[in-house]
Amino acid sequence: MINQQLLHPESIVVIGGSNNVHKPGGAIVRNIINGGYKGVLRIVNPKEDEIQGVKAFHDISELPPTDLAILVIPAHMCPETVDRLAEEKGVKAFIIISAGFGEETKEGAKLEQHILDTCERYGAALIGPNCIGLLNSWHHSVFTKPIPTLHEKGVDFISGSGATAVFILESAVTKGLPFNSVWSIGNGKQIGIEDVLQYMDENFDPERDSHVKLLYIENVGNPDKLLFHASSLIRKGCRIAAIKAGSSESGSRAASSHTGAI
């Protein structure tokens, strides 16, 4: 499920945020700050009092209620963290950057399923795990560079591969191509490419929204849903360009890094 806490959170907490901008936990904090996020940014780090000028909480128990949580911590710590955030702090949206889930081991798949079950029980949105994050005009919750020029009529880009997303963004930035949003779905445990298209279709405003969608597809959980909403958006005047990975040897290797979505 895609909700307003995911798209336009009034408050964000980065679990595992750090001062090291060369690591995901530090880079994502930097991007949120540099992106001009106007809500309240919070960080949980048990070893620091301040992260990049932002007060750091040492434990989840110290946090006020928060809309969106971004997890940049080891996979084995994520299920309990999601449980606590959803139950104790009313978090309604999660972006899990961490890898080490169903794309790697059966034990990782169990951790991933636990997280999904918790999100479903509390009515929370889930992006990931194993992704680079979500980027829109409201919040730049990605740990990668470059950050493209954002414009409401720019491209909506949805990718199953974080590495491919970065490659395409690097190429697009040099050509001056603007974006409206960038979605890295990772393993797509709850929200897949077809779910993002569904949201864009059902909430489409021809005066306000982008008319161009770019898809990099590794796996599709519900092909009929993808086709239905892609066709609907095209009838509304949108143009969709899609690349399906996995047909070549190199594509198959890339797709296998997100086998948790198969």
What is each of the regions a protein language model found here?
Residues 1-262:
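Catalytic-core regions of core metabolic enzymes
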